Regions:
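A generic, well-ordered mixed alpha/beta core segment in the N-terminal half of proteins
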Residues: 1-29
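Alpha-helix-loop-beta-strand connector modules within alpha/beta enzyme cores
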Residues: 4-9, 54, 289-298
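Active-site-proximal loop/turn and secondary-structure-junction residues that shape catalytic pockets
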Residues: 24-28, 70, 143, 163-165, ...
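Short acidic, glycine/serine/threonine-rich loops at helix termini
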Residues: 30-36
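An alpha-helical appendage that flanks or caps ligand/catalytic pockets
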Residues: 40-128, 165-267, 300-301
Length: 304
């Protein structure tokens, strides 16, 4: 990244930015090839909560090196698990019991220190001088502690899932206004794109009612597959909740949903091709969105 930005920024008038996103990865298969797996029985018991802590350890190394620091593993945050890291007493007690057995303790500990995952001597990156003003960092995490922590080092924007509830989105904006690193300037609502599935039907030969019904059917099938992939089971309640976040319908319906649900300053990241391998249809949907939905939304906002 430093090399790329050094070359990219050779032109002093260059304004195009490099946007780099990083996250822990939602699925196990993303992390396993890189050795991010439980190393002990304690880590295995704590794994759902521990993965987020590993992300913060790795993020600190990544960001401090980008900042130009000389660091070693002794300078990186330590991972200490307590009850606060777990959703229930039962989950925490399982980890405590694993620690008692693994470490031959006489009683359940109140805190469990996890050895550093990344052990290294003094390290820095070169080149040290590059156009950091052309770098935009985005963390894919919904954890408020992680969002706050990474911004103690460098300006890091955040990213939300298409199924994130409006309440969580608004709370994130409020928090980021307080914790966003000052070197990044004032936090703006557009700094966190609002991700949304778009199930738009503007197909020829259908009435507006038929387009609406077809879009609903496409959305139900796709969102059911999405939750099945995430959790291994289809939960109708969660499918309905995801549908409430998605944009579904004909041109007029999608435009109306955007105006009613979204803040006027939101930046929309529209996801068109989920569960749809018909490239021509995807392109038609994208064209209809830009040529018909967007102008309609703009006119509705102007008249509001």
């Amino acid at each position: 990244m430093a090399n790329l930005l050094s070359l990219h920024g050779l032109n002093p008038d260059e304004e195009r930015c490099l946007h780099v996103g990083f996250s822990a990865g939602r699925f196990e298969f993303m992390a396993r090839p890189y050795g991010v797996i439980p190393r002990t029985a304690v880590e295995e018991a704590a794994w759902p909560a521990l993965r987020g802590q590993i992300f913060m350890e790795a993020a600190e190394i990544f960001l401090r090196l980008l900042r130009g620091d000389v660091i070693n593993s002794d300078m990186i945050r330590s991972t200490v698990l307590t009850r606060a890291n777990f959703r229930s007493d039962e989950d925490w007690e399982k980890v405590q019991d694993a620690a008692v057995e693994f470490e031959a303790l006489s009683s359940r500990p109140d805190a469990i220190e996890i050895p550093s995952r990344y052990v290294f001597e003094d390290l820095k990156i070169i080149p040290t001088e590059f156009r950091k003003d052309l770098l935009r960092l985005v963390a894919g995490t919904h954890d408020p502690r992680a969002q706050t922590f990474v911004n103690t080092i460098l300006p890091v924007k955040v990213f939300n899932l298409s199924i994130t509830s409006p309440d969580v989105i608004d709370a994130t904006h409020e928090r980021m206004q307080e914790v966003y690193h000052p070197d990044g300037g004032q936090w703006k609502r557009g700094d966190m794109p609002r991700t949304s599935f778009v199930f738009l039907n503007d197909e020829e030969g259908l009435t507006s009612e038929e387009q609406s019904a077809a879009a609903q059917a496409e959305a139900e099938q796709a969102l059911g597959a999405y939750w099945n992939a995430l959790e291994g089971t289809i939960d109708p309640t969660k499918v309905n909740r995801a549908a409430n976040n998605a944009l579904i319908g004909n041109v007029e319906e999608v435009a109306q949903q955007m105006v009613e649900r979204f803040h006027p300053d939101d930046r929309i990241m529209a996801w068109f091709d989920f569960f749809n391998h018909d490239s021509e249809r995807v392109c038609r949907n994208m064209t209809a969105y830009m040529q018909r939905v967007v102008p309609l939304v703009e006119s509705m906002l102007e008249g509001a």
